[in-house]
A protein has these predicted regions:
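Short, polar/acidic, helix-capping and beta-turn segments at strand->helix junctions
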Residues: 1-114
C-alpha cells in the first residue's frame, strides 16, 4: 500500500511505501534569513512532518542536501550538527544546485524507515 501525506496536484509532502517514508524536498519559510537560519527552519519542518507520520529524526536513513552555494556548507552544518543526535547521523550527500527560488539557500530531502 502507498500512503500520500498532504498530497497536491504536483507532489505530496511525504509518501509512505514499503516500510519507508520519503519526504519531498523541504525549503525554508524564512527566505531572507542566512543559511544557518534557513537550515534550522527546514530541519524544524522535517521534524514536524516526521511527527505527523509518527516518527522522529532518529528514523532518518538517508538525506540529500541541496545548497544554492557551496560557500554556505559550514553555515548549513552549524544548524545540522546541533540537530543530529550523536551516533544517529544518516547517510548524507550535499550538492550544489540552483534552487527554484533564488532566495532559498538550502533544500533538504529525507528518507526515513518506519
Amino acid at each position: 500500500m502507498i500512503q500520500r501525506i498532504q498530497p497536491s496536484k504536483r507532489y505530496s509532502e511525504a509518501v509512505i511505501a514499503n516500510g519507508l517514508v520519503f519526504l519531498s524536498g523541504m525549503v525554508p519559510d524564512n527566505p531572507d534569513a542566512d543559511a544557518t537560519a534557513q537550515t534550522a527552519n527546514v530541519l524544524a519542518q522535517i521534524d514536524a512532518l516526521l511527527t505527523e507520520v509518527g516518527l522522529t529524526k532518529s528514523r532518518i536513513v538517508d538525506t540529500t542536501i541541496y545548497l544554492a552555494d557551496m560557500a554556505d556548507y559550514n553555515a548549513m552544518n552549524a544548524a545540522w550538527d546541533l540537530w543530529v543526535a550523536e551516533g544517529q547521523a544518516p547517510a548524507r550527500a550535499t550538492v550544489e544546485a540552483r534552487l527554484a527560488d533564488p532566495l532559498w539557500k538550502v533544500e533538504i530531502k529525507v528518507t526515513a524507515a518506519l
